[in-house]
Amino acid sequence: MNINDMNDAPEVSSSESQKNEIVSKQKLLEAGTYFGHKASLWNPKMKPFIHSKKMGTHIIDIAQTRKALEYAYKLIEKYAQKGASFIFVGTKKQAKDVVKAQALRTNSIYVSERWLGGTLTNSRTIMNQVRTLSDLEKLEESGYEGYTKKEGVEFSKKLAKLQRNLTGIRNMKHLPQVMIVADVNTDKIAIKEAQRKNIKIIGILDTNSDPSLVNFGIPANDDSVKSLNLIITILADAIVAAKNGKQLFAYQGDEAIVFPATSENVGKDGEERKPRKPYVKRRPDGDFQPRHNNNESETK
């Protein structure tokens, strides 16, 4: 079956049939994986993955999203079976929680806050900072004994900063073999370091992304919390499956996929969509009244 045939494939309805596919089209649609960016912001290299343009916005071909997701799953599972280690990277607001959660679930290292330059290319500097982190934690346990209150406050601030930036990588003993990136535009520095160290890169590609930055890309919305949660969790499922663990989303059917509750409503260009205020027109006397729909007859 080629990609065009997949576009016209019938919807799967039975629970058992859904478990034969990595994820249903319905869940891809529900997660908003198909929303791209404004057409004016696109990267021409993403043209093969764009289905259409609607109201000035590119629509991603979810048939290709699902096909790429399945391939990436098998690729990651194969690496994991061979004992590869992974690093999850996602420093944008929408990706932080799922990146951290799935990295911890798979016993992988992760960066969900600021990427520290040299994380992969200057291990000596990073290890020195990790040692400083450990020393400050010991000082905190002692109540900063022997130091003034002012010095204790300064130590606490430095400790909080180091914990925020280093917690996900403090146990890194060697370089990972595979990097999973939530947004290739936001975390270009991480990608460049991975390229220098010949680390395989698997990333989500929105319509404004450069697919040449990764070894394998998954065309999908990288701004939606639901989209990121769905894709990152499925990729993590591949690592878990290689170790005979329980999968959460991949090949589990629609009923198993529950998206996180969030008040954030992220638009296709990374901006929160704010509800439109109802239109009102001003009366001559200065009061306001709602505008009636012209198609509705007024009740007399």
From Swiss-Prot:
Disulfide bonds: none annotated. Belongs to the universal ribosomal protein uS2 family. Signal peptide: none annotated. Residues 261-300 are annotated as: Disordered. GO terms for molecular function: structural constituent of ribosome. GO terms for cellular component: cytosolic small ribosomal subunit. Residues 282-300 have a biased composition (Basic and acidic residues). Keywords: Ribonucleoprotein, Ribosomal protein. The gene is rpsB. This is Small ribosomal subunit protein uS2. CDD domains: RPS2. InterPro entries: Ribosomal_uS2 (IPR001865), Ribosomal_uS2_bac/mit/plastid (IPR005706), Ribosomal_uS2_flav_dom_sf (IPR023591). The keyword Ribonucleoprotein applies. The keyword Ribonucleoprotein applies. GO terms for biological process: translation. It holds the Pfam family Ribosomal_S2.
